[in-house]
Design a protein with these regions (language model features):
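Conserved N-terminal alpha-helix of the aminotransferase class I/II PLP-enzyme fold
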Residues: 2-51
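Hydrophobic beta-strand scaffold residues
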Residues: 16, 69, 90, 146-147
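Short, small-residue-enriched loops and turns at beta-alpha junctions
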Residues: 22-26, 77, 98-99, 121-126, ...
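Conserved PLP-anchoring active-site segment centered on the Schiff-base-forming lysine
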Residues: 58-77
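Short, structured coil segments at secondary-structure junctions
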Residues: 65, 85-87, 142, 173
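Active-site phosphate-binding strand-loop segment of PLP-dependent enzymes
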Residues: 91, 95-148
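Active-site C-terminal subdomain of aminotransferase-like
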Residues: 142-145, 152, 157-206
Length: 206
């Protein structure tokens, strides 16, 4: 890894020289994004300098005042920061409590044009896993989007380490997958994996 990084620096330099929409959209970024997207199984992806930057910036692109975000009580603090940076309404449900999630959705979802559910696949504090199939059932019932943070499972679970969601066989039911490179990969950075449309918005606005 050290040698690959050194070689890339000598070839591409260390500065982006501009935003992704201008001079900062290098081919090596596009190739890396597509390689990882193919590996995980999503159509496209966008890289971030860090997992924190990713988590704290994406919701201002994804959500507005007509959006309800329903988040597990134990998601990472940077995700909460990102949600609070947006104009969305945040309601949190008790950790892994599907009955409480159902109550929250029943009470609030009809007041908003879009609903986003946010959880982690494996939670960092206790190492427990999300009841993903139950969440997907509620997601479908309320026509919500589902964002799953795989920071603590990517590289450890799934075929070749492609994530816990893949291991559970439900990747197609997850709208956005978030991965971080600071854990199993031993690097830095983060990546959002989703549809071509969502990734294009991220490249344009983040």
């Amino acid at each position: 890894l050290k040698q690959c990084i050194a070689d890339a620096i000598m070839t591409y330099g260390v500065g982006s020289t501009g935003s992704r929409r201008l001079s900062g959209n290098h081919q090596i970024f596009l190739d890396t994004e597509q390689y990882i997207a193919n590996w995980v199984g999503k159509p496209a992806g966008v890289l971030f300098n860090s997992g924190f930057q990713m988590n704290s910036s994406i919701f201002s692109v994804l959500a507005d005042k007509t959006t309800l975000i329903v988040a597990d009580k134990l998601i990472h603090a940077s995700l909460i920061d990102g949600i609070q940076n947006s104009d969305a309404q945040l309601v949190r449900f008790r950790h892994n409590d599907m009955d409480h999630l159902a109550q929250v959705l029943k009470k609030y979802a009809h007041n908003y044009s879009e609903v986003i559910i946010v959880c982690e696949s494996i939670y960092s504090m206790d190492g427990d896993t999300v009841p993903i199939h139950d969440i997907i059932q509620l997601k479908n019932e309320y026509n919500a989007k589902l964002i799953v943070d795989e920071a603590h499972s990517i590289g450890l679970y799934g075929v070749g380490g492609n994530g816990w969601i893949n291991e559970q066989g439900c990747l197609s039911d997850v709208d956005i997958v978030l991965v971080a490179f600071g854990k199993a990969f031993g690097l830095s950075g983060g990546m959002l994996l989703s549809s071509q449309d969502i990734v294009a918005k991220m490249r344009a606005k983040c």
